Amino acid sequence: MAPEFESGTKMATTIQKSSCAYVTFLAGNGDYVKGVVGLAKGLIKAKSMYPLVVAILPDVPEEHRMILTRHGCIVKEIEPLAPSLQSLDKYARSYYVLNYSKLRIWEFVEYSKMVYLDGDMQVFENIDHLFELPDKYLYAVADCICDMYGEPCDEVLPWPKELGPRPSVYFNAGMFVFQPNPSVYVRLLNTLKVTPPTQFAEQDFLNMYFKDVYKPIPYTYNMLLAMLWRHPEKIEVNKAKAVHYCSPGAKPWKYTGKEEHMDREDIKMLVKKWWDIYNDTTLDHKAQGSTVEANRLRGAAFSDTNISALYITSPSAA
């Protein structure tokens, strides 16, 4: 159940507290649940005013559901969604096919606006101001920072020609701001039926579908670890508000430091920061009125971030 807030608490926006939420996705009975717990605790530490909804597939065991509930998450079961289970060889990794199920979150119409975060992300600063972004657009961070400025780069992912013209900027689907909408949800599903599977699954699909309403936002809202060695001159790790541990060997709960790039000092520091949050028992969810909840209410719901400053003018398509 979503936490209730004191009616006297004022906010720096007209958005209703109950109408917004963060959302993530979880499948299977593996240890990814640790990532979601870490994310939930990170949002508490950042004094977010909004709950974390976890969209789970039916194969998530009851034990993991109870863990999520104990940490204050709103658990919502969804049905799997995939264009074809017979085309697993089309994906960069076979399990990417599960990620099409993320499209179900457009059906969460009890929320007017949501911020999607992958379960292997961690939030280090309050990002509630993202809910203030103007409606009717999808906001996300470019998958490669060079793409934001139209600079040629070997690290930019190849665009599947079968999906039509390449978007001017290709975003990473590990974090995005969107509005649930039943009409959009139906159109997404209908479009998926006639869209061939591609290497990066739902990420390619979302880039194709939302190319006309996509707005880039700064890398600080989804700092991919690979940017630290691909484009170190463009990255300031201490400015990252949310970090995406998506590189091979980077999942903090599996980290050994043995995979390529994982022995870097900045990676070790970010893994430690994740564990510091995960192991902090003062961030464990408690009932309303607890110290944690009181701190969330006292914290600023929105930072002093200038919302208009988030917009990055994307280069025109070639």
UniProtKB/Swiss-Prot annotation:
Quote the catalytic residue positions.
102
Q: Where in the cell is it found?
A: Cytoplasm
| Highest taxon of source | Eukaryota
A GO molecular-function descriptor: metal ion binding
- GO BP field: cellular response to cold; cellular response to desiccation; galactose metabolic process
The main location class comes to: cytoplasm
Amino acids binding Mn(2+): 118, 120, 244
Q: Cellular component per GO? A: cytoplasm
Q: What is its EC number?
A: 2.4.1.123
What is the uppermost EC class here? transferase
Q: Does the keyword Lipid metabolism apply?
A: no
Looking at the UniProt entry, the stretches that span the membrane are none
Inducing stimuli:
Declines within 8 hours of imbibition in a gibberellin-dependent manner. Induced by dehydration but not by cold in germinating seeds, and induced by both dehydration and cold in leaves.
Q: In which tissues is it expressed?
A: Expressed in seeds, mostly in radicle tips.
Catalysed reaction(s) here are: myo-inositol + UDP-alpha-D-galactose = alpha-D-galactosyl-(1->3)-1D-myo-inositol + UDP + H(+)
Question: Needs which cofactor?
Answer: a divalent metal cation
Q: Which InterPro entries match?
A: Glyco_trans_8 (IPR002495), GNT1/Glycosyltrans_8 (IPR050587), Nucleotide-diphossugar_trans (IPR029044)
Keyword terms of this UniProt record: Carbohydrate metabolism, Cytoplasm, Galactose metabolism, Glycosyltransferase, Manganese, Metal-binding, Transferase
* Purpose of the protein: Galactinol synthase involved in the biosynthesis of raffinose family oligosaccharides (RFOs) that function as osmoprotectants. May promote plant stress tolerance.
Q: Which family does it belong to?
A: Belongs to the glycosyltransferase 8 family. Galactosyltransferase subfamily.
- Name-wise, this protein is Galactinol synthase 1
Gene (UniProt)? GOLS1
